């Protein structure tokens, strides 16, 4: 199996886990954790050439770059059922700020300074420590139009990218 195929396979599994967790109403931090991981692995798989003998870089900053690359790929645009390149570019551009927020859910971005779905944090030494299971992550509300749009795109990309 190639690095590309392995990352795409794992991305699909991570997303299926996110969907299963969502159906069981487990704490939202776990859904967000799997969202961040599946989007990162999709990006790494997509950006890694099939012939690569080296794994992708060990970075969490891959999803936004992946979307930017996809924006210029006519075959991806067509598979996502967009006939107009400008409309597709606008669609992707409209998601980039939110995709950046999802990408920044990785604890390495948040460090001890802010909310992430994996590790407890506190903003200042005077603040209490917060566990992710007790935080509601309001910017990622599942009813948020950007969240819905991003989840739809992720689902579609996981189906079409090989």
Predicted regions and their residues:
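Long, charged low-complexity segments
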Residues: 1, 47, 51-162
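Charged alpha-helical initiation segments
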Residues: 1-37, 45-59
